[in-house]
């Protein structure tokens, strides 16, 4: 994968709670004026789809299945698709760590 540490570093994690359907923009398909309670009340952890799209654009990636948009323009995230970029990022960090250790060993530190 071309997505690794640079891409992961460009992502901003957020915490949020779902809004009640009545609080959504009335143009969105999930809007329902009669539903005043959120379906999920637990604190959620994740990304903002628009920011993921920007990070993908910044890395010239057009075929990452971790970001989607439906026919109505609603953007979404598929979190399981972030596993491979995360593995790549760990591999890149491991290689950097190995190189730094070698430099320290060579310097007798």
Question: Where are the regions a protein language model picked out?
Answer:
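Stable alpha-helical elements in mature extracytoplasmic
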Residues: 1-7, 48, 86
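Glycine-rich, acidic and aromatic/proline-enriched surface loops and short helix-turn segments
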Residues: 10-13, 49-62
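Short, conserved beta-strand/beta-arch hydrophobic-aromatic motifs that form part
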Residues: 44-46
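Short linear sequence elements within intrinsically disordered, low-complexity coil regions
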Residues: 21-23, 50, 84-87
